[in-house]
Amino acid sequence: MGEYTAKDVAALRKETGAGMMDCKKALEETSGGLEEAKDWLRKKGLAGATKRAGRSADQGAIDVSVNGGVAALVELTAETDFVAKSEDFRGLVARLVAQVSANGDAGLAEQPFEGTTVGEYVTQAASRLGENVGIGRVVRYETTDGLVDSYKHIQNDRGVIGVLVELSGVDASNAAALEVAHDVVLHIASAAPRYTTRSDVPADAIERERAVLTELTRNEGKPEASIDKIVEARLNSFYKDYVLEEQGFVKDPKVTVGSLVSGLGGSAAIKRFARVKIGEE
């Protein structure tokens, strides 16, 4: 019997939606491994594919910016919601975004900043605010052959989701391209894709999904000769769930995000994206 805690059961229930007893059984059967327990539940048909919930983070705030061909995103973490939504804290993350936009993200902690360095300033802010404060995820895109856009979802007075996207093969002054880029960042915030294209999905992730779907299909009593075909069809559903280009556009699910962008003509394509949410890794 695997060793696990009540917290493990709660985490598994939260991520899979499975019942408490099923979660306990899954943890027992997999020696307490959370990822293995998720797969066990799915193979038994007791849970669907789940969005990666990730490690639970502290509180914090996110800010984003676009300045010409440069887009930047900074996550600043804190211990409490009270500090994270304070004017002092939100002002700091906004200034850090401007810093990253202007000076890049390399060696951020050592960069000169307001009479000291970024790292030292954040340490001073932690002392002033009375709790642990740190720089979380930092993303910066710079384009010369396309355009960038950003979106920040605000909740409780501070940014909790930040998105950046870069489109290549488009004119940054084209109104239609600008509109599509903004539609894409809004879509990413809502749909939480993991990958840009199918080729970006790691081989081990595909094999893990195929193994789970194969056993699930077999447990459903499907004819052995049909299993491979059924599994491949279900893998296509996996791609539609997690690959940005293949997701149905939130405003019109009959249209994929990839076709929305390619409809701009020429070599228009999604080059890359980033989505950061407070509380998720």
List PLM regions with ranges.
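N-terminal assembly/interaction segments in proteins that build large macromolecular machines
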Residues: G2-E281
